[in-house]
Structure formats: C-alpha cells, structure tokens
C-alpha cells in the first residue's frame, strides 16, 4: 500500500504541475498571468484580464487536478491519511510546477478539488466560507486564508480522520499567501474585480 501511495503521490504532483492558467491564457491570446495583477497563475488573476470564461475554465481544471488523483486513490482503497498526502502532492505540483520553472499558484482551487472526494460537505463549507469573505471584503486572497483557517475545524467535526493532512495542507496554503498578507496589511492588495491594463499577448 505504501508503494501505491508513493506512486499516486508522484502522479498527483505531475498532474498538479500542469499550469492551466498559463495554458488557457495562451489559447485565449491573453497575457501570461505571471506578468500582471498579483502575478499568480490562477483563476482569480486570469479573471483580472476581463475574460470570465477563461477564468472559469482555469478554476474548474485546477480543481480537477486535485479531484482526479484523490478519487483514484480512494477507489484503489488507499487509507484516509494517505489520501490526504496525495492531495497535498497535487497542491505542491500546482504551487511548484515541474513544467513551468516551479512558478506556480496558491493551490486553493486544487485543494478544494482534493477535498471533494473526501466529502462534499467539507468542500461545501469551504466554498461557502470563501464566498462569504469574498463578498464582504472583495479580496480573494483573504477569502482563501479564511477558508484555510477554518478548514481543519470543519474537517475535525465532519471527517476527523482527515484532520492532520488537511491541517498540513492549509498551513501550506497560508504560507503561500505570505506576499498577499503583506499587501493586505499595507493596503496594496488588489480586489478580485479590479481590472489591470494589459498588453496583448505576443505570439
């Protein structure tokens, strides 16, 4: 079982390393999301380009990077604790992608996707938390941090066997937001609906 867990973790990392924000931006003739806005290759920053459809596609594909390996591992009978580590591997791939010089995103959508096979209730609580904070503040980063802070509590109440890996994953997500936290404290963090002047992508 341990060998299978390592193999699935490797697959999860490689799948997570696919930077959908960069690829979809190229397909839609949008600028590289690493070069404008928050410089984060994720759905929120793609949304700042003004292309909502592209942002939605990126969000869904990033979620699938977490859902697919964790669901396959669950189907293969891998124990709960190891399922959590496979989800972490997918998020590490998103954060430090092998194919894109290790310049990745924050891992929020991928983490959410990884939680869905573990329980729709946990995923739903995280989505609701994220939406509430976003609607009240307008900051996607603050919404992600709020959801990450509460996710271990939700997990402990609903699926306690997953608490440790979920807590580890949430710590990783919060650490990845250290620049956002600094900008929030300084009042320089862009809101999710703020648009940035963009240059056309050069082929």
UniProtKB/Swiss-Prot annotation:
How does this chain sit within the bilayer?
Multi-pass membrane protein
Record's function text: Catalyzes the transfer of an acyl group from acyl-phosphate (acyl-PO(4)) to glycerol-3-phosphate (G3P) to form lysophosphatidic acid (LPA). This enzyme utilizes acyl-phosphate as fatty acyl donor, but not acyl-CoA or acyl-ACP.
* UniProt-listed GO biological process terms: phospholipid biosynthetic process
The record's GO molecular-function terms, alphabetically, read: acyl-phosphate glycerol-3-phosphate acyltransferase activity
Q: What is the top EC class of this enzyme, as a single word? A: transferase
Q: In which pathway does it act?
A: Lipid metabolism; phospholipid metabolism
Q: Does the keyword Magnesium apply?
A: no
Name the reaction it catalyses. Answer: an acyl phosphate + sn-glycerol 3-phosphate = a 1-acyl-sn-glycero-3-phosphate + phosphate
Q: Which residues cross the membrane?
A: 4-24, 68-88, 104-124, 125-145
Q: Which GO terms describe its cellular component?
A: plasma membrane
Q: Which UniProt keywords apply?
A: Cell inner membrane, Cell membrane, Lipid biosynthesis, Lipid metabolism, Membrane, Phospholipid biosynthesis, Phospholipid metabolism, Transferase, Transmembrane, Transmembrane helix
Which organism does this sequence originate in? Answer: Tolumonas auensis (strain DSM 9187 / NBRC 110442 / TA 4)
The record ties this protein, via Pfam families, to:
G3P_acyltransf
- E.C. code: 2.3.1.275
- What subcellular locations does the record give? Cell inner membrane
Could you give the subunit structure recorded for this chain?
A: Probably interacts with PlsX.
Q: What is the protein's name according to its record?
A: Glycerol-3-phosphate acyltransferase
**Chief location of this protein?**
membrane
Which family does the similarity line name? Belongs to the PlsY family.
Q: Could you name the domain of life of the organism this protein comes from?
A: Bacteria
Note the SMART domains from the entry.
Answer: G3P_acyltransf
UniProt cross-references to InterPro entries, sorted A to Z: G3P_acylTferase_PlsY (IPR003811)
């Amino acid at each position: 079982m341990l060998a299978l867990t390592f193999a699935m973790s490797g697959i999860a990392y490689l799948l997570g390393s696919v930077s959908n924000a960069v690829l979809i931006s190229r397909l839609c003739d949008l600028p590289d999301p690493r070069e404008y806005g928050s410089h984060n290759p994720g759905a929120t920053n793609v949304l700042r380009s003004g292309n909502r459809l592209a942002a939605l596609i990126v969000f869904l594909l990033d979620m699938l990077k977490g859902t697919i390996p964790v669901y396959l591992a669950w189907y293969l009978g891998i124990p709960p604790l190891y399922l959590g580590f496979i989800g972490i591997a997918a998020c590490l791939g998103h954060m430090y992608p092998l194919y894109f010089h290790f310049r990745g995103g924050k891992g929020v959508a991928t983490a959410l996707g990884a939680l869905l096979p573990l329980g729709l209730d946990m995923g739903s609580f995280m989505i609701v938390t994220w939406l509430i904070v976003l609607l009240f503040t307008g900051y996607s980063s603050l919404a992600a941090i709020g959801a990450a802070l509460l996710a271990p509590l939700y997990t402990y109440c609903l699926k306690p066997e997953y608490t440790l890996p979920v807590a580890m994953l949430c710590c990783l997500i919060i650490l990845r937001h250290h620049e956002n936290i600094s900008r929030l404290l300084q009042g320089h963090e862009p809101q999710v609906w703020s648009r940035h002047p963009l240059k056309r992508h050069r082929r």
